[in-house]
Amino acid sequence: MAEIAAELVAVEKALWSGTATAVIAETTEGEIGVLPGHEPLLGQLVENGVVIIRTTEGEKLVAAVQGGFLSVSSKKITVLADSAVWADEVDQADAEARVREASSEEEKSRAESELRAVKRSKEK
């Protein structure tokens, strides 16, 4: 199976770097799936979206991301997010409570993004 270098980087830290068979991201133009050999592009990530990385080892990595960019070149896919959290690090009960008790639309949207990431991580 074809592979490409990929990385997920948040402003505060690098979350993952390796080789991937696919990267799926929610951009302002819609959800986009990027495979090795994709045409170069630069996309803007939605404010409270989900990114999925399928590694060459067969892992499915899912993260909730808050804004940023998706950069695709012939040699590398880079997801540069303002902030990001892995789906498996999300406390689902806490996120559900934050959705109910959010004092701002931004807080609610971030918690909803985390819950979507958890849900997407459980899909095949």
From Swiss-Prot:
GO cellular component: plasma membrane; proton-transporting ATP synthase complex
Disordered: region residues: 97-124
Classification via CDD domains: F1-ATPase_delta
Disulfide cysteine pairs (residue numbers): none
Pfam families linked: ATP-synt_DE_N
Keywords: ATP synthesis, Cell membrane, CF(1), Hydrogen ion transport, Ion transport, Membrane, Transport
Subcellular location: Cell membrane
Membrane disposition: Peripheral membrane protein
Main localization category: membrane
GO molecular function: ATP binding; proton-transporting ATP synthase activity, rotational mechanism
The keyword Cell membrane belongs to this UniProt entry's keyword annotation: yes
Assembly and interaction partners: F-type ATPases have 2 components, CF(1) - the catalytic core - and CF(0) - the membrane proton channel. CF(1) has five subunits: alpha(3), beta(3), gamma(1), delta(1), epsilon(1). CF(0) has three main subunits: a, b and c.
Alphabetical list of HAMAP family matching this protein: ATP_synth_epsil_bac
Family: Belongs to the ATPase epsilon chain family.
NCBIfam families per the UniProt record, alphabetical: ATP_synt_epsi, PRK00571.2-5, PRK13442.1
Protein name, as recorded: ATP synthase epsilon chain
Phylogenetic classification of the source organism: Bacteria, Bacillati, Actinomycetota, Actinomycetes, Mycobacteriales
Gene (UniProt): atpC
